[in-house]
Structures are given as structure tokens and as C-alpha cells.
Swiss-Prot record:
Molecular function (Gene Ontology), one example: membrane insertase activity
Name listed for the protein in its UniProt record: Membrane protein insertase YidC
Annotated stretches, region: Disordered: 34-59
PANTHER family: CYTOCHROME C OXIDASE ASSEMBLY PROTEIN COX18, MITOCHONDRIAL (PTHR12428:SF65), OXA1 (PTHR12428)
Keywords: Cell inner membrane, Cell membrane, Chaperone, Membrane, Protein transport, Transmembrane, Transmembrane helix, Transport
Record's function text: Required for the insertion and/or proper folding and/or complex formation of integral membrane proteins into the membrane. Involved in integration of membrane proteins that insert both dependently and independently of the Sec translocase complex, as well as at least some lipoproteins. Aids folding of multispanning membrane proteins.
Membrane-crossing segments per the record: 6-26, 331-351, 360-380, 424-444, 477-497, 512-532
Compartments it resides in: Cell inner membrane
Subunit (UniProt): Interacts with the Sec translocase complex via SecD. Specifically interacts with transmembrane segments of nascent integral membrane proteins during membrane integration.
GO cellular component, one term: plasma membrane
BP GO terms, sorted: protein insertion into membrane; protein transport
Membrane topology designation: Multi-pass membrane protein
Length: 553
């Protein structure tokens, strides 16, 4: 293989790896969707989107930011499920917490459960209802009452409905009904607005949701950002905190869902109606990343003693591919592996199948690596055989290079003639590497973003397959912390593999090939340990295959 071709290949691979590490190549924030419009800027509260019919009463502001002190005590109701524990408080019948029982906040065994709703928002709690023409009624903080007991346990696979009601005497009655299904992260909300007066009520309802980044701002990264995402006509649109800070947006239907998510978790809001609503996001605190997302209905009117209902569905939980698929609403689209999704998603299912029998995700990765190696075995075999043929004609190639070193064009002609005579493809040794690059990046995206592997141990010091491997050695190594043992082993096996590969006959090319293990070790040092494990096992299998080919050449 010509030196320039090899250099181009190596540089291309390194550029791709570098770009993915630092710039999130496969999941860049999308531009605003076609159905997104600019909201009119104001010096006080953001103005209501200019989509309200002229004849309708138009509110002059989004719902006010009703805040309570997080340390205040209120009457509350707990909903207990094998998957989660949810609490609803009396003021506004809002969610005060939603913790996932099967997922921890940190890798430590004593770490608290992952909180999808938390009072760390400073008292901004989701599902706060307001009537925009009558915000003085303070529905989002008015006490709601319920006949439900203080604790509801979901069992017997029967959905439970918990209803909460409040009244503004002589004006309006509001009922919020939550429908919870056992062992499901789906939650349904129905809001009923009843006009208690004899006069016509013309209004517009807003339901506010509040989100904080899933990780502290200093730990947020470009390849695992907390961001607002919409699914519109099968296409994902992403908006980071920085995007939302630049301008006021109005998100309009049709959309399948809008969500706040990162690689591992998602808070999805699923409109039940096909139209008659819009979403308005705005940043309340850029330092903390506090986001308010307001669901606005179209203006409506109620005659005396008339009632109107509004429905929403939610998915609050992990981005487990199989779980999202069962939840429908195209929620599985939220698991986005970029350009190589069509490769990565099948790999997730295969990995999950292996895990069901091994109960160890690290072992499942090893088995998956073996399967991939078997699939690529014929191509790799031809590649190694091609390199063996190249090795046999090395003396003739050297003679040609010496004879025509002053005439590069003639030298290349003679070399191509030599390749044809001995039926050797000079690029044959590169084919398996080129074909494995898409699989490599698909695995990288999968292992870096699969919640199934989050905080899952392999063995010994490897306690999180989505995090870099670090062996504590009693002191911190600069920029690393612990010792990346798995990564070093990967580099060593790659070096052994290069030593076993037949020489191309060009000393400069051989030097480049020997530098590759060092470069890969440096790049892999902060990659997920699950990905390093895959590459290490793949190297070991390649060494075994190369040894067999060398013995039978």
C-alpha cells in the first residue's frame, strides 16, 4: 500500500475521532424547526405568541413564576410503583418529586435514586396550571384537595386514577386527574375547567414545566448535553440552553412530543390533541440552566356551568430502547445514535439479549465483539492473506523502487504491473479497517449513551461501563486521576498486532504503523470503558487470527 494512502487513512480516522470527542459530531443542535416562530420581544414578560385570533382575548404574559420555599411543609400524596416513587403536593397539585428506583444519581452503591423532578429548581415545580386572563386566581399555588390516601401503591396491573380539585368560589372549578399504570413510566393528565358562574368565561390555559440539567453545569458535555428536543414528522430538533437564551421561541404543532433529555433520561410531554396548542420555552436562570416550558392552549370560552377538558401524556424515565418502544408515540426515536443509528440500535438489542443470559454487561460486550469478529472473519482473512502476498513480493518491490527511484511515474507503473502479475491488491489490507469504522462509531455512540450500561460494573475496578476506566493507585495522576489499565492493555495488544502484521517494506510507513497504538491509546484514555473493552477483545481476537494465518501461510 502506498505511503500516502496509509497516511490519508490514519489522518481521516484520527480527525473523525477527535471531532466526535470534542464537538459531538453525530448530534449537533438542529436549527429551529419550520413550525417555530420568533415570539415578540418585550422588556418585561415575554409576549404571548401571535397566533391568537384577533377576536379572542389575548393574554399579555405567560404564566407568572409561582415559587414556594422548598423547605415548607405541605399536605402531599405519594404514588409508589416498582419503577418509581412520585409525590404530589397540595399547592397546585404539582409534582414535588419523581425518583427512579432502578437508577442511581451516581455510581456509588449508597447514592440516592435518580431524581427526574426535584425541589432544587428553587421551588419551581412542574404541572403548574394558570388561566392566563385570571392569573390573580393563583391556581398554580391554590390548595387542591383529594379523596386519595397519603400513599397509593400501584399493583394488580390496574391503572389508578388520582383526582385533585380546587375552586375559586363562584368563579371556576379545576380538577387535575393523574392516571398511573403499574410498571410503566407513562403518566396521563386530564385537566377539567368548570365555569361556576352564569357568565361566559373567555380564557387560555397554560401548564408550566420546569427543568434543570441532569448533571451539574460544570459536568455538562457536548456529547451528553441536557437539551430540549422535539420530534416533528419523524425528525428530531435539538435546542440547548444556549440556543434558547438567544431568542424567544414558539413551538407549534404538529409534533409527536417535546422533551427535556440527555443521553440517559427523558422527560417527554406528548400532546394528545392534534392541534389547539403550542409550547413556549424560556430560560429563567442561565447560570443554573433552569428552563420553563409552557404548554399553552388556544383561547377557549365556557358558557355558564360548562366544563372543558384538556389531556396530556408524559413519559418520565430512562431512555431504555425496549421500554421506549413499548411506550409507543415514537419515543424510541429519542435514542439517537446519529449517522450510524441503523447499526447501533440492532447492536443494543443483541447486547441486551446476551445480558439476559450472562447478567453482566461487560461479558455481553465480549460476546458481541466475538459475534462481530466472526461476521468480519472472511474479510479479515482475505486481508491477512493479501498482506502475506505483499510480504512475498517485497524483494521485487524493493528492486523496482531502487531501479526507478529517480522516475516516480515509471516506478508506480512497474509496481502496478507487479501487483497484477501476482494478483495482489495493495489496498486489501485496509479493507477490514475501513469496514469496521462504521461499527466502531456505532458502538461508541451506543456505549457512550446507553442507559442500560450506566453505572453497570464489569469486574474489579470497572464499575461503570459508560465511564473511562480508572484504577485507584493511592494518588492522582495529572489529568487522569487513576491508572487507565484497560486502555493501556488495549494499546499493548494493538502494538503486538502491528508487530505481527507483515511489513509494507517502506521504513517510513512502518514507523507510522508503529505510532498508531500510541495515538489510539491517547485518544481512548477518556472513552467509555465498555468501548475500550470492545477494542481490547477485538485486538486479542485479531492477534489470534493473525497468528493462525502466519502459521499456515
Amino acid at each position: 500500500m502506498e505511503k500516502r494512502a496509509l497516511i490519508a487513512l490514519v489522518l481521516s480516522l484520527l480527525v473523525l475521532v477527535f471531532w466526535e470527542m470534542y464537538f459531538g459530531l453525530f448530534r449537533m443542535p438542529a436549527p429551529p424547526p419550520n413550525k417555530t416562530e420568533q415570539a415578540a420581544p418585550t422588556t418585561t414578560q415575554p409576549a404571548t405568541p401571535q397566533t391568537v385570533p384577533p377576536q379572542a382575548a389575548t393574554p399579555q404574559a405567560l404564566p407568572q413564576d409561582h415559587v414556594f420555599r422548598p423547605d415548607q411543609q405541605f399536605q402531599s400524596w405519594a404514588i409508589e410503583d416498582p419503577l418509581y416513587r412520585m409525590n404530589i403536593i397540595a399547592p397546585g397539585a404539582r409534582l414535588s418529586s419523581f425518583e427512579l428506583k432502578k437508577h442511581r444519581k451516581a455510581v456509588q452503591p449508597d447514592s440516592p435514586p435518580m431524581q427526574m423532578v426535584t425541589s432544587q429548581t428553587g421551588g419551581y415545580l412542574p404541572m403548574a396550571i394558570d388561566l392566563l386572563h385570571h392569573q390573580d386566581w393563583q391556581l398554580s399555588t391554590r390548595p387542591f384537595f383529594s379523596e386519595a390516601g397519603p400513599k397509593t401503591v400501584l399493583e394488580d396491573k390496574k391503572p389508578r386514577v388520582l383526582s385533585f380539585s380546587t375552586e375559586v368560589p363562584g368563579k371556576v372549578r379545576v380538577t387535575k386527574s393523574f392516571t398511573c399504570s403499574p410498571e410503566s413510566y407513562l403518566l396521563d393528565l386530564e385537566v377539567q375547567i368548570g365555569n361556576l358562574s352564569s357568565e361566559r368565561l373567555v380564557d387560555q390555559m397554560g401548564i408550566s414545566f420546569y427543568f434543570l440539567p441532569f448533571s451539574p453545569p460544570e459536568e455538562e458535555s457536548s456529547y451528553n448535553p441536557s437539551q430540549l428536543t422535539t420530534l416533528e414528522k419523524g425528525s428530531l430538533k435539538n435546542f440547548t440552553t444556549k440556543d434558547l437564551s438567544k431568542s424567544d421561541l414558539v413551538l407549534k404543532p404538529p409534533m409527536t412530543w417535546v422533551a427535556y433529555e440527555n443521553n440517559f433520561f427523558i422527560n417527554a410531554i406528548i400532546p394528545v390533541a392534534e392541534g389547539g396548542y403550542q409550547f413556549v420555552p424560556r430560560i429563567l436562570d442561565a447560570t443554573k440552566g433552569l428552563l420553563q416550558l409552557v404548554y399553552l392552549t388556544d383561547p377557549f370560552q365556557l358558557e355558564g356551568n360548562e366544563t372543558k377538558s384538556f389531556k396530556l401524556r408524559f413519559y418520565i424515565g430512562p431512555k431504555e430502547l425496549s421500554t421506549l418502544a413499548r411506550a409507543e408515540h415514537q419515543l424510541a426515536s429519542a435514542v439517537d445514535y446519529g449517522w450510524f443509528t441503523f447499526i447501533a440500535k440492532p447492536l443494543v438489542y443483541v447486547l441486551d439479549w446476551f445480558y439476559r443470559y450472562t447478567h453482566n454487561w461487560g461479558v455481553a460486550i465480549i460476546l458481541l465483539t466475538i459475534v462481530i469478529k466472526i461476521l468480519f472473519w472472511p474479510l479479515t482473512q482475505k486481508s491477512y492473506q493479501s498482506m502475506q502476498k505483499m510480504k512475498k513480493i517485497q524483494p521485487k518491490m524493493t528492486q523496482i523502487r531502487e531501479k526507478y527511484k529517480g522516475d516516480r511515474e515509471k516506478m508506480n507503473q512497474e509496481l502496478m504491473g507487479l501487483y497484477r502479475t501476482y494478483k495482489v491488491n495493495p489496498m486489501g489490507g485496509c479493507l477490514p479497517m475501513l469496514l469496521q469504522i462504521p461499527v466502531f462509531f456505532a458502538l461508541y455512540r451506543m456505549l457512550n449513551g446507553a442507559v442500560e450500561l450506566r453505572h453497570e460494573p464489569f469486574m474489579l475496578w470497572i464499575d461503570d461501563l459508560t465511564a473511562p476506566d480508572r484504577l485507584p493507585i493511592g494518588f492522582d495522576i495529572p489529568y487522569l486521576g487513576g491508572l487507565p489499565v484497560l486502555t493501556l492493555l488495549m494499546g499493548i495488544t494493538m502494538f503486538i498486532q502491528q508487530k505481527m502484521t507483515p511489513s509494507a517494506g517502506d521504513p517510513r510507513q512502518d514507523q507510522i504503523m508503529m505510532i498508531m497504538p500510541v495515538m489510539f491509546t491517547v485518544f481512548f484514555v477518556n472513552f467509555p470503558s465498555g468501548l475500550v473493552l470492545y477494542w481490547l477483545v477485538n485486538n486479542v481476537l485479531s492477534i489470534a487470527q493473525q497468528y493462525w494465518v502466519n502459521r499456515h501461510a
